[in-house]
Amino acid sequence: ERVLGNLVNNALRYSSQRVAVSLTLQGSRASLLVEDDGPGIAPEERERVFEPFVRLDPSRDRATGGCGLGLAIVHSIAQAMGGEVRCEASPLGGARFCFSWPVYHQLPDFTSA
């Protein structure tokens, strides 16, 4: 819940019109993808967005709000769950954040009566 909220809030903060959210399950991994059409992120800045208190564009701070902790929290949750979060963005515009984690299925034991 916290991961979804932080990723969507971040996308809404920087997007001009569109935010898309999808959830997929592939084998034993689930992936949450949040995409926006915001200003984009330069390749050399993609890892920095997960550091606490990092704001890539301080000139937008007053207009967009936030304190630079949302993506750092997502990163910490990903590590705690044995998952990962990554940023795929173009400096020309738009960003995709993918949060993936292992899913452990507990199947019922039908052999005992």
Residue spans of the language-model regions?
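Conserved polar catalytic motif of the HATPase_c/GHKL fold
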Residues: 5-6, 10
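Acidic ATP/Mg2+-coordinating residue in the GHKL
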Residues: 36
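Short conserved segment of the HATPase_c
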Residues: 41-55
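Short alpha-helical Gxxx[C/S/T] motif in the catalytic ATP-binding
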Residues: 70, 74
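Glycine-rich GHKL/ HATPase_c ATP-binding element in histidine kinases
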Residues: 93-97
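Short beta-strand/loop element within the Bergerat-fold HATPase_c
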Residues: 18-28
